[in-house]
C-alpha cells in the first residue's frame, strides 16, 4: 500500500487543503507545524484543533513538527519534515504547488549536482536574500525562470532538495483557487491568509473551510496577543545574541527599534532589509519570544492524532521508531513545550497544549 506524506500547517484548514488530501494516495501521514508556523508567527488556532480538522478530512495520522523544524527557513523546514516522514515509512510525498514541473527530475539533478549547486550559491552577492540566491541557482542549473511570489512552488523546490537521494516518489498537486498570500474574499477556494485576515466575517469563514465551526469556536490568536511578552523579553534580555539565529546586527536593529514601535508589524518593518527578509525577522522575533536557543531535535515523534488505519500503521513501526503519545513528567522536546506554554498565554480560554494531552481519534469523537 502506498504511504503518502504531506507537510502542512493548516493555518487554518480550508477547502484547498481538503482537495490536497483527497488527491493524495493510500495511507496519508501529515507532518504538521505546532503552535508556531514557518513564516514566524503563532498559528491562528492551536495544533490540536488543526490536527482534528485534518483527521476529519482524510488524514490517517498527524504528527507534530518540533519547534526548531516548524519555525525555520524553507530548506530546513523541508529537510526536518521529510526526515520525520521517512522515519514513519512514507514512500510518496504529496504537496501543493502553483507550478507543475517534473520535480522528480529536479530531485535527481540535485542529488547529482548538490555540491556544485551549493558552491554556486556562495558566489552570489551578499546583498541578495537567500530565496533570491536559490531562485538564481535553479535558473542556472535547471533553466527555471524566476518564480516570484509563489511560496508553494518555492517550498516544493525545498522538498526537491530534501528528497534528493531518497527512495521517495514526489506527487505535485496543482494548487487551486486563491494565491497563497491572497486576501481576496471572492475566490472559489480562499487562502488561509484570507481566512486569517477576515476571521471576524463568519459567513466568509463558513464558505471557506469545511471545519468552520471548529475554527470559529476555538480561541484565536495573532502576533499582537504576544507583543507585550516579546517587548519585555527584548528590553530585559542582557544579550539578544544568546537566542537562536540572532546575530549582532539583528540584535542591534531590534533593540534600536523596539521603543518606537507599537506592533509586531511595525517592528518587522523597522528591522527588515533586503538582506534580512520580513519572514526571517518574524522567525527571529519568534525565537526571542520563546527564548529559543540551538538544541538537538528530539528523537521521539509526537503523535497528535490518528484514524483506525493510522493506528494500525503505528503498530507496524513502533518497535523501530520512538513514538510519543502522551507527554507527562518526562519531556518530549523542552523547546517545543516552552513554545506551547508561551502560546497558551495568548488567550485566557486557550486549553492545555502539552501535559496529559492524548492523540485525537475521530472515531472516538463520533
Swiss-Prot record:
EC nos: 6.3.4.-
Chief subcellular location: cytoplasm
GO biological process, one term: tRNA modification
Pfam families: HIGH_NTase1 (PF05636)
Binding sites annotated in the UniProt record for ATP: 7-20, 96, 152, 175
Keyword Membrane in annotation: no
Class in the EC hierarchy, top level: ligase
Compartments it resides in: Cytoplasm
Source organism, top-level taxon: Bacteria
GO MF entry, a single one: ligase activity, forming carbon-nitrogen bonds
GO CC annotation, single: cytoplasm
Catalytic reactions of this protein: cytidine(34) in elongator tRNA(Met) + acetate + ATP = N(4)-acetylcytidine(34) in elongator tRNA(Met) + AMP + diphosphate
InterPro entries with a match to the protein in the record: Rossmann-like_a/b/a_fold, tRNA(Met)_cyd_acetate_ligase
Keywords assigned: ATP-binding, Cytoplasm, Ligase, Nucleotide-binding, RNA-binding, tRNA processing, tRNA-binding
SUPFAM superfamilies membership: Nucleotidylyl transferase
Function of the molecule: Catalyzes the formation of N(4)-acetylcytidine (ac(4)C) at the wobble position of elongator tRNA(Met), using acetate and ATP as substrates. First activates an acetate ion to form acetyladenylate (Ac-AMP) and then transfers the acetyl group to tRNA to form ac(4)C34.
Family, as annotated: Belongs to the TmcAL family.
Protein name as it appears in the record: tRNA(Met) cytidine acetate ligase
Organism per entry: Streptococcus equi subsp. equi (strain 4047)
Gene: tmcAL
